[in-house]
Amino acid sequence: MYLANHSPLHFYRVLVVLLVSLALTSSCSQPVPKPTGPAADYQDAKDMFKRGRFDRALEFSDGLASAAPATKFTERAQVLRAVIFTGLVKSNKELVDAYTKGADQTKNSHFKAEYDRLRHDNTQAGIGAALGLAETAHQLLEGGKVSKELILETPYPSVEGPLEVADLARVREGGWVEPDRQESAAIDSLNKGVDDALAEAVSGDRSKAREALASGSTNISGLDFALFLGNQLVEAASFFDRRHGRDPQKLKTVCDEGYEAVKAAETLLKETPDKDKEKQVEKLEYRIQTTLKNV
């Protein structure tokens, strides 16, 4: 009996029972809890951003960005929204430019009418994006201040935009692009705009942005982001100049937020002087002053 109880067969039978018990215990353990509240909203925003659903990312991050009192996700949501609105501004500016030139170049009255309509529609979309960027800047730079370090927490979009949108090049020459190609060009332009916004936000190119976000987040200098945001606000303000929306009050509103970026940058530079950054702030301030004259 002693030998039977300690035979190799008995040993392996006991080992199998232990392994099965361990597997059952593991399978019955509690699942990792899903995030709730603000954490869930921000996770949804990141998921939508990765999928290129930037409109949905804005929806999920809206309440977070304006939360009072602020949560740990409020500032992160503001940074993410600043990037998205910047991408939207870039995209709509590109589309407006293409369809404006296309309408001027074409000899076909039907093409001209369609391109004029698209120019108008994208101008309106650009105005909305510009105001969204100004609102986000107001939240992030309230009182002309910004954190020394910010967090851009999001994965890089799974679909990368092209470096150039081929169909828009054809439009600029007055050539016709079918409606389905117009839609795909708009999507390509948006993906391109967001990719370029990410690159500028991390003070580099797309490759640097992709690398920086490989782990899902990256730290950004508050000074650099204030400069980035200020310059993007200048670009956004052009939607209200005499060539586009012709709205002096909104142009001033957007430029005022640009001045808040200047103040935020200057505050940080007082703590840590940097001649090169000081020159960049001066250049930004000059750009704002010049833009205010285009009413």
Residues of each region from the PLM?
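Bacterial Sec signal peptide processing site at the extreme N-terminus
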Residues: C28-D44
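Bacterial N-terminal signal peptides
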Residues: V14-T25
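Alpha-helical segment of the N-proximal tetratricopeptide repeat
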Residues: A39-G63, A67, K192-G204
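Short coil/turn linking the two alpha-helices of tandem helical-hairpin repeats
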Residues: G87-V96, A103, A166, E173, ...
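Short solvent-exposed coil/turn linkers within tandem alpha-helical repeat scaffolds
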Residues: V32-P35, L64-R76, D104-K192, A199-D205, ...
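Residue-level recognition of tetratricopeptide repeat
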Residues: K46, V83, K90, L198, ...
